[in-house]
From Swiss-Prot:
The lineage of its organism: Bacteria, Bacillati, Bacillota, Bacilli, Lactobacillales. Pfam families: UPF0223. InterPro entries: BH2638-like_sf, UPF0223. Belongs to the UPF0223 family. This is UPF0223 protein gbs1030. Disulfide bonds: none annotated.
Length: 93
């Protein structure tokens, strides 16, 4: 069972602005699973996230860590948003 109290996969070398961008993206992913999220909001936050997390390897590592602790996949959320293109997505179980 996934705990509702989990930590976010953050890099200690990030500055406050970078942490804010990453957290905004992870929060949008949470909203996609827990309720629904506007596709544009999720994709915009992903673009900002990618300015901080430039490498695919680090992005995959963050996805794995976040999925392990929260049960939510950043990859699946972005994939669904890109396929939907507009409106809202909901990945709730």
């Amino acid at each position: 069972m996934i705990s509702s109290n989990y930590s976010y996969p953050l890099d200690p070398s990030w500055n406050t602005e970078d942490i804010t961008k990453v957290l905004r993206f992870l929060n949008q992913v949470e909203h996609a699973y827990e309720n629904s999220v506007k596709v544009d909001d999720l994709l915009d936050s992903y673009k900002e996230f990618k300015k901080v997390v430039k490498s695919k390897a680090q992005e995959k590592q963050i996805d794995r860590e976040f999925q392990r602790t929260s049960g939510y996949s950043t990859y699946q959320a972005v994939k669904a948003a890109q396929q939907q293109a507009k409106g809202f997505i909901s990945l709730g179980r």
